[in-house]
UniProtKB/Swiss-Prot annotation:
HAMAP family: D_Ser_dehydrat. SUPFAM superfamilies: Tryptophan synthase beta subunit-like PLP-dependent enzymes. Its cofactor is pyridoxal 5'-phosphate. The keyword Lyase applies. It catalyses: D-serine = pyruvate + NH4(+). Signal peptide: none annotated. This is Probable D-serine dehydratase. One of its GO terms (molecular function) is pyridoxal phosphate binding.
Length: 441
């Protein structure tokens, strides 16, 4: 399936299941050798290391302007935590053996903007700021970047504008970081963006432009608006390699976090990482970093709402960004606002298709159930998008075809580590979180 023949595509049995909003799990029929998979993009390990070096240069500045980063010396990072009670209760709920150990990656509680977007979004703003500052002679690569916290630097950056299209969290991270540096910022937000996120941005002086349409329209309009201003830099969530590399740094850093927790990752102790997927930049970048750090022993699996399975649809059909969920009759309406994306990134889909084991869809009903369980069992509050990874553990443990295709035996499954990548929730106001929990009842 490589041409857009919608009629033929809609006869496919998996597409029929997607059209019916069913929860499905689809995986690549056989694993691609990692060396081959990594060659699908021109990006390399050196590019990820360059991104980490840039974040290190900015650490003194970040530590100075964000009090919450003082304890980490300006490093934006989240912890991994064991979730044994969640594992016990979910295993009973799924009627599966509680194999391996379950962990949660708390990007939901990343400092500054409380979501995974604090990685890619903030990194791209910093990369752009550095480029401008170096060119203007405000800093050199050897300087302490904390000197960018000055009226002179803010005045300089105010001559420039940053624009982005977002369903919410990316706009939040880019808006907060850009405003702190002194940039003028416009965030073009889709209809499904939460009101509190818009209110937060406006309180920082960010220009929020609202659309009655979905994410794709917000991005397109943001791109058009930026074209008319030569001093406006548009952050393109669909195609940005800079965003992608900002996320990839997390993959490299996770390796050390696993070592610190005495978590073994090798042929007999596989690591399964479950990543919620919207347009694809966040999970794609993280997976790219993970594959460079841990090789074939890490299995990355993407989770999408039943109403918005854009990456699964793009990769499965081979059409990537040439097809959207509306083409098969889906409405792209989900409580998981961060995942309400109708058309996947073609760049990410093509770059990562041989490195991702599989893709599954999850209903809003299950999302709310897992929000409730995570709150009750671990006292961790997450937004709907952030719990999408939970259902993946069920698929890995019960899908015999997947286990055979990826040569996973009973001992490996017993020794496995399952990491649910929680993508957001830390900045959700208490009254909004109560609404989520009420919907779970």
């Amino acid at each position: 399936m490589t041409t857009l023949n919608i009629q033929a595509i809609q006869q496919d049995s998996l597409i029929k299941s997607l059209k019916n909003y069913e929860e499905i799990f689809w995986f690549q029929p056989e694993p691609t050798p990692i060396e081959q998979g990594l060659k699908r993009t021109s990006l390399t390990l050196a590019d990820i290391q360059d991104a980490e070096a840039r974040l290190t240069r900015f650490a003194p500045y970040l530590e100075k302007v964000f009090p919450e980063l003082r304890s980490t010396q300006g490093k934006i990072e989240s912890e991994i935590v064991s979730i044994p009670t969640m594992q016990h209760d979910c295993s009973k709920r799924f009627a599966i053996e509680p194999n391996g150990t379950w962990w949660l990656k708390k990007d939901s509680h990343l400092p500054i903007s409380g979501s995974i977007k604090a990685r890619g979004g903030i990194y791209e703003v910093l990369a752009h700021a550095e480029k401008l500052a170096l060119k203007a002679g405000l800093v050199t690569l050897q300087d302490n970047y904390s000197q960018l916290d000055s009226d002179q630097a803010r005045q300089f950056f105010s001559n420039y504008q940053i624009a982005v299209g977002s369903t919410g969290n990316l706009g939040l991270s880019i808006g907060i970081m850009s405003a702190k540096l002194g940039f003028r910022v416009s965030v073009h937000m889709s209809a499904d963006a939460r009101q509190w996120k818009k209110d937060k941005l406006r309180s920082l002086g960010v220009n929020v432009v609202e659309y009655a349409s979905d994410y794709g329209v917000a991005v397109e309009q943001g791109r058009k608006a930026a074209e008319s201003d030569p001093n406006c830099f548009f952050i393109d969530d669909e195609n940005s390699t800079t965003l992608f590399l900002g996320y990839a740094v997390a993959g490299l850093r996770l390796k050390q976090q696993l070592i610190d927790q005495n978590i073994q990752v090798d042929a007999e102790h596989p690591l399964f990482v479950y990543l919620p997927c919207g347009v694809g930049g966040g999970p794609g970048g993280v997976s790219f970093g993970l594959k460079h750090a841990l090789g074939e022993h890490v299995h990355c699996i993407f989770a999408e709402p039943t109403h918005s399975p854009c990456m699964l649809l793009g990769v499965y059909t081979g059409l990537h960004d040439q097809i959207c969920v509306a083409d098969i009759g889906l409405d792209n309406a989900t409580a998981a606002d961060g995942l309400a994306v109708g058309r996947a990134s073609g760049f990410v889909g093509r770059a990562m298709q041989d490195l991702i084991d599989g893709y599954y869809t999850i209903s809003d009903q299950h999302l709310f159930e897992f929000i409730r369980l995570m709150d009750q069992t671990q006292s961790i509050q997450l937004e709907p998008s952030a719990v999408a990874g939970v259902l993946g553990i069920y698929h890995v443990n019960t899908n015999k075809s997947y286990q055979q295709a990826y040569h996973l035996n009973a001992i490996q499954l017993k020794n496995a580590t399952h990491l649910i990548w929680a993508t957001g929730g830390g900045m959700v106001p208490p009254n909004e979180m109560q609404k989520y929990l009420k919907q779970c009842e």
